[in-house]
Amino acid sequence: SGAGGGGGGFITSLSGGSGGGSSSETAASLQPSTNYTITVGAGGAGAVYNTSGAIGASGQESSFNSLISKGGGGAKSYGGGGQSSGANNNKASGGGGSFLTSIDSLSSNPGTGTSASRGYGGGLGSTGSTNGAPYCGGGGGAGGAGGNGGGGSAGGAGGAGKESVITGVSTFFAGGGGYQSATGGGAIAPTSAGNGNSGTSGTGGGGSGANHSYSVGYGGG
Protein backbone atom coordinates (compact mmCIF):
# COMPACT_ATOMS: atom_id res chain seq x y z
CA SER A 1 0.00 0.00 0.00
CA GLY A 2 1.27 3.49 -0.81
CA ALA A 3 2.14 6.06 1.81
CA GLY A 4 -0.25 8.97 2.43
CA GLY A 5 0.63 12.64 2.07
CA GLY A 6 0.61 15.06 5.01
CA GLY A 7 -2.20 17.56 5.54
CA GLY A 8 -1.51 21.27 5.26
CA GLY A 9 -0.78 23.32 8.37
CA PHE A 10 -3.89 24.53 10.23
CA ILE A 11 -3.87 27.94 11.90
CA THR A 12 -6.82 29.60 13.66
CA SER A 13 -7.63 32.23 16.26
CA LEU A 14 -10.73 30.33 17.39
CA SER A 15 -10.83 28.31 20.61
CA GLY A 16 -9.47 24.78 20.45
CA GLY A 17 -6.01 25.63 19.19
CA SER A 18 -4.18 25.39 15.88
CA GLY A 19 -2.77 22.19 14.41
CA GLY A 20 -0.10 20.04 16.02
CA GLY A 21 -1.21 20.85 19.56
CA SER A 22 -0.21 24.50 19.25
CA SER A 23 -2.14 27.40 20.75
CA SER A 24 -4.63 29.52 18.87
CA GLU A 25 -3.24 32.59 17.15
CA THR A 26 -4.08 36.14 18.18
CA ALA A 27 -6.98 37.38 16.09
CA ALA A 28 -5.91 39.70 13.28
CA SER A 29 -6.93 43.33 13.53
CA LEU A 30 -8.38 44.24 10.13
CA GLN A 31 -9.19 47.72 8.90
CA PRO A 32 -12.22 48.64 6.79
CA SER A 33 -11.71 49.69 3.15
CA THR A 34 -8.31 47.96 3.13
CA ASN A 35 -7.24 45.29 0.66
CA TYR A 36 -5.58 42.18 2.08
CA THR A 37 -3.72 39.60 0.02
CA ILE A 38 -5.05 36.03 0.26
CA THR A 39 -3.30 33.09 -1.39
CA VAL A 40 -4.67 29.54 -1.42
CA GLY A 41 -1.91 27.05 -2.11
CA ALA A 42 -2.51 24.07 -4.36
CA GLY A 43 -1.95 20.52 -3.17
CA GLY A 44 1.27 18.85 -4.26
CA ALA A 45 1.09 16.34 -7.10
CA GLY A 46 1.50 12.66 -6.30
CA ALA A 47 4.51 10.73 -7.54
CA VAL A 48 4.35 8.80 -10.79
CA TYR A 49 2.83 5.35 -10.32
CA ASN A 50 5.15 2.32 -10.43
CA THR A 51 8.35 4.35 -10.10
CA SER A 52 10.93 3.12 -7.60
CA GLY A 53 12.10 5.84 -5.22
CA ALA A 54 9.39 8.27 -6.34
CA ILE A 55 8.31 11.04 -4.02
CA GLY A 56 5.17 13.15 -4.03
CA ALA A 57 5.49 16.92 -4.10
CA SER A 58 4.73 18.98 -1.03
CA GLY A 59 1.69 21.25 -1.16
CA GLN A 60 2.16 24.94 -1.78
CA GLU A 61 1.88 27.48 1.00
CA SER A 62 -1.25 29.48 1.74
CA SER A 63 -1.27 32.95 3.24
CA PHE A 64 -3.47 35.71 4.59
CA ASN A 65 -1.71 39.05 4.74
CA SER A 66 1.50 38.20 6.68
CA LEU A 67 0.29 34.88 8.14
CA ILE A 68 1.72 31.91 6.23
CA SER A 69 0.91 28.20 6.40
CA LYS A 70 3.01 25.67 4.50
CA GLY A 71 1.49 22.85 2.48
CA GLY A 72 1.50 19.20 3.49
CA GLY A 73 4.57 17.03 3.04
CA GLY A 74 4.65 14.62 0.11
CA ALA A 75 5.04 10.91 0.83
CA LYS A 76 7.96 8.89 -0.48
CA SER A 77 7.97 5.31 -1.64
CA TYR A 78 10.40 2.41 -1.92
CA GLY A 79 12.71 2.68 1.04
CA GLY A 80 12.53 6.40 1.78
CA GLY A 81 10.91 8.71 4.29
CA GLY A 82 8.32 11.38 3.60
CA GLN A 83 8.98 15.09 3.26
CA SER A 84 8.48 17.26 6.32
CA SER A 85 7.56 20.23 4.09
CA GLY A 86 9.32 23.33 5.30
CA ALA A 87 10.65 21.96 8.59
CA ASN A 88 12.61 25.16 9.17
CA ASN A 89 9.51 27.33 8.85
CA ASN A 90 7.41 27.73 11.99
CA LYS A 91 4.22 27.53 9.93
CA ALA A 92 5.10 24.20 8.31
CA SER A 93 2.68 21.32 8.13
CA GLY A 94 2.73 17.69 9.13
CA GLY A 95 4.94 15.35 7.16
CA GLY A 96 4.14 12.64 4.66
CA GLY A 97 4.09 8.97 5.61
CA SER A 98 7.03 6.68 4.97
CA PHE A 99 7.40 3.55 2.90
CA LEU A 100 9.61 0.56 3.70
CA THR A 101 10.23 -2.40 1.43
CA SER A 102 10.73 -5.98 2.51
CA ILE A 103 13.54 -6.13 -0.05
CA ASP A 104 16.08 -3.70 1.38
CA SER A 105 14.83 -3.38 5.00
CA LEU A 106 16.29 0.13 5.20
CA SER A 107 15.33 2.43 8.02
CA SER A 108 12.59 4.66 6.65
CA ASN A 109 11.66 7.74 8.65
CA PRO A 110 8.47 9.68 7.98
CA GLY A 111 8.28 13.43 7.61
CA THR A 112 8.10 15.24 10.94
CA GLY A 113 5.68 17.69 12.48
CA THR A 114 5.68 19.57 15.80
CA SER A 115 3.45 21.94 17.74
CA ALA A 116 5.43 24.81 16.24
CA SER A 117 4.80 23.42 12.77
CA ARG A 118 1.01 23.23 13.17
CA GLY A 119 0.94 19.56 12.26
CA TYR A 120 1.89 16.06 13.41
CA GLY A 121 4.34 13.68 11.80
CA GLY A 122 3.62 10.83 9.42
CA GLY A 123 3.57 7.13 10.28
CA LEU A 124 6.33 4.56 9.90
CA GLY A 125 6.39 1.98 7.15
CA SER A 126 6.48 -1.72 7.93
CA THR A 127 7.58 -4.94 6.25
CA GLY A 128 4.99 -6.99 8.11
CA SER A 129 3.01 -8.31 5.17
CA THR A 130 2.73 -11.98 4.34
CA ASN A 131 3.00 -11.62 0.57
CA GLY A 132 6.13 -9.48 0.37
CA ALA A 133 4.31 -6.19 -0.21
CA PRO A 134 5.08 -3.56 2.44
CA TYR A 135 2.63 -1.60 4.57
CA CYS A 136 3.14 2.15 4.42
CA GLY A 137 2.61 4.85 7.00
CA GLY A 138 -0.18 7.42 6.89
CA GLY A 139 0.46 11.13 6.51
CA GLY A 140 0.40 13.42 9.53
CA GLY A 141 -2.60 15.65 10.16
CA ALA A 142 -3.27 18.84 12.08
CA GLY A 143 -5.09 16.87 14.79
CA GLY A 144 -3.01 13.71 15.06
CA ALA A 145 -0.05 11.70 13.79
CA GLY A 146 -0.28 9.30 10.88
CA GLY A 147 -0.72 5.63 11.73
CA ASN A 148 2.09 3.14 11.31
CA GLY A 149 1.86 0.54 8.58
CA GLY A 150 1.32 -3.12 9.32
CA GLY A 151 -1.73 -2.86 11.54
CA GLY A 152 -4.20 -5.38 10.16
CA SER A 153 -3.88 -5.98 6.44
CA ALA A 154 -3.07 -2.56 5.02
CA GLY A 155 -1.11 0.65 5.45
CA GLY A 156 -1.59 3.10 8.28
CA ALA A 157 -4.47 5.53 8.57
CA GLY A 158 -3.93 9.22 7.95
CA GLY A 159 -3.66 11.50 10.97
CA ALA A 160 -6.91 13.15 12.02
CA GLY A 161 -7.69 16.67 10.93
CA LYS A 162 -8.43 19.53 13.31
CA GLU A 163 -12.11 20.19 13.96
CA SER A 164 -13.24 23.79 13.59
CA VAL A 165 -16.45 25.77 13.13
CA ILE A 166 -14.70 28.52 11.15
CA THR A 167 -17.21 28.08 8.30
CA GLY A 168 -20.18 27.97 10.66
CA VAL A 169 -20.38 24.19 10.32
CA SER A 170 -18.19 21.75 12.24
CA THR A 171 -15.54 20.56 9.74
CA PHE A 172 -12.26 18.66 9.99
CA PHE A 173 -9.38 20.44 8.28
CA ALA A 174 -5.86 19.37 7.30
CA GLY A 175 -6.14 15.64 7.89
CA GLY A 176 -3.35 13.37 6.69
CA GLY A 177 -3.85 10.91 3.85
CA GLY A 178 -3.53 7.17 4.28
CA TYR A 179 -4.54 3.82 2.86
CA GLN A 180 -7.25 3.86 5.49
CA SER A 181 -9.42 6.96 5.69
CA ALA A 182 -9.04 9.72 8.27
CA THR A 183 -11.25 12.62 9.31
CA GLY A 184 -10.29 15.53 7.11
CA GLY A 185 -7.81 13.53 5.03
CA GLY A 186 -7.85 11.76 1.69
CA ALA A 187 -10.62 9.38 0.75
CA ILE A 188 -10.12 5.62 0.99
CA ALA A 189 -7.55 4.58 -1.57
CA PRO A 190 -8.13 2.57 -4.74
CA THR A 191 -8.25 -1.19 -4.28
CA SER A 192 -6.18 -1.87 -7.37
CA ALA A 193 -2.75 -0.70 -8.48
CA GLY A 194 -2.59 2.99 -9.34
CA ASN A 195 -2.12 6.43 -7.86
CA GLY A 196 -3.80 7.48 -4.63
CA ASN A 197 -6.75 9.82 -4.44
CA SER A 198 -6.45 13.57 -3.95
CA GLY A 199 -7.44 15.20 -0.67
CA THR A 200 -10.79 16.94 -0.39
CA SER A 201 -10.71 20.39 -2.00
CA GLY A 202 -10.87 23.29 0.45
CA THR A 203 -9.94 21.34 3.58
CA GLY A 204 -6.14 21.14 3.23
CA GLY A 205 -6.26 17.36 3.65
CA GLY A 206 -3.50 15.12 2.33
CA GLY A 207 -4.17 12.62 -0.44
CA SER A 208 -4.55 8.91 0.22
CA GLY A 209 -2.06 6.22 -0.56
CA ALA A 210 -3.01 3.30 -2.77
CA ASN A 211 -3.06 -0.48 -2.73
CA HIS A 212 0.26 -0.78 -4.52
CA SER A 213 3.87 -0.67 -3.45
CA TYR A 214 4.92 2.25 -5.64
CA SER A 215 1.95 4.57 -5.16
CA VAL A 216 2.09 7.57 -2.85
CA GLY A 217 -0.35 10.25 -1.73
CA TYR A 218 -0.58 13.92 -2.55
CA GLY A 219 0.50 16.67 -0.14
CA GLY A 220 -2.27 18.94 1.12
CA GLY A 221 -2.35 22.63 0.24
Language-model regions, residue ranges each:
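Low-complexity, glycine/proline-biased repetitive segments and flexible coils/loops
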Residues: 1-221
